Amino acid sequence: MAHVAEWKKEEVNELKSLIDKYDVIGIVDLLNIPAKQLQEMRKSLHNKAVIRMSKKNLIDLALEDCNASKNNIVDLSEHMEGQVAVIATEMNPFKLYKILEDSKTSAPAKPGAIATDDIVIPEGDTGFEPGPFLGELQQVGIPAKIDKGKIVVSKETVLVEAGEEVSAAVASTLSRMDINPMEVGIDLRAVYEEEAIYTSEVLAIDEEQTLADVQNAFRNAFNLSVNAAIPTEETISTIITLAYTRAINVGVDAAIMTSETSEPIIGLAQAKMLALASEVSGTEGALDDELAEKLSNVAVAAAPVVEETVEEEEEEEEEEDAEEEAAAGLGALFG
């Protein structure tokens, strides 16, 4: 039987203790992160999360041993890529992912690095005087020329597509142009919480879109609850108001007299009476003196509105005439 180094046993035990202590356990990739930057990131996570670097096979062993108490946690082994480390926290996976993503910074492209996104060179002035750098740009595939005493990029260009390797020449050119296209930070590969594994694809959500979706779902649920008359804490007030309004309308339409409906019923009846009286007012003897007076009062009350409208129209016409005269005067002035 092969002898197992004591330090490996201790390392597995410490990993197991860490995994057992926290509810949320993740696998992160620390590849290509400079030591100083990693130290700053770990400091920023102080009291929020613990990062422990270790060998993949030792992490595998720790996950297997912890699978009895944390069902399915062994599945994290499927997501170990790059320079692996374990991250342990009490934050929910989505918050952890956001914090790690927000901590990422831009960095220069190194020869041999794989572009995670398209590296785009924008159109415009490079800030360089005419010289050998023009040939260097053209050599790596950047359309450049001299314009007004400066080297300019004549057209926006995708220099390196996502997934392609950055050559030494391209890395040198990008460095001289002060373009830092790479993103350096802790990559969260997968997280375990309550027997579920969340990959980075699941955790990468659009916060604004998610909020809009939740608000839309709430509106739809609210409307459904109101229309189906399903009372809840949020909808009961609206349901009662809607029911009251509908009851009043039914009472008015059916001429059922109550303390709430009597006034609108009488008002509606009077309006119908006056409308009918107006229709027959041209027939001699059709209206008694009282009804004729009421109809006359309605007509007089409406007259000022009509006169005011006519006056406003006349004023508008006068303003338009004045504007046309002014325009004609300006036309004559400027030939």
UniProtKB/Swiss-Prot annotation:
Disulfide bond annotation, renumbered to this chain: none
Question: For this protein, what is any one GO molecular function term?
Answer: large ribosomal subunit rRNA binding
NCBIfam families linked: PRK04019.1-5
Query: What Pfam families does the entry give?
Result: Ribosomal_L10, RL10P_insert
Q: Which organism is it from?
A: Methanobrevibacter smithii (strain ATCC 35061 / DSM 861 / OCM 144 / PS)
Function of the protein? Forms part of the ribosomal stalk, playing a central role in the interaction of the ribosome with GTP-bound translation factors.
* Identification of the protein by name: Large ribosomal subunit protein uL10
Q: How does it assemble?
A: Part of the 50S ribosomal subunit. Forms part of the ribosomal stalk which helps the ribosome interact with GTP-bound translation factors. Forms a heptameric L10(L12)2(L12)2(L12)2 complex, where L10 forms an elongated spine to which the L12 dimers bind in a sequential fashion.
Q: Which BP terms does GO give this entry? A: cytoplasmic translation; ribosomal large subunit assembly
Please give the GO cellular component terms listed in this UniProt entry: cytosolic large ribosomal subunit
Q: What HAMAP family does the entry give?
A: Ribosomal_uL10_arch (MF_00280)
What domain of life does the UniProt record list for this protein's source? Archaea
> What are the start and end residues of every segment in region (Disordered)?
306-335
Q: Write out the entry's keywords from A to Z.
A: Ribonucleoprotein, Ribosomal protein, RNA-binding, rRNA-binding
- UniProt family annotation: Belongs to the universal ribosomal protein uL10 family.
Q: Does the keyword Ribosomal protein apply?
A: yes
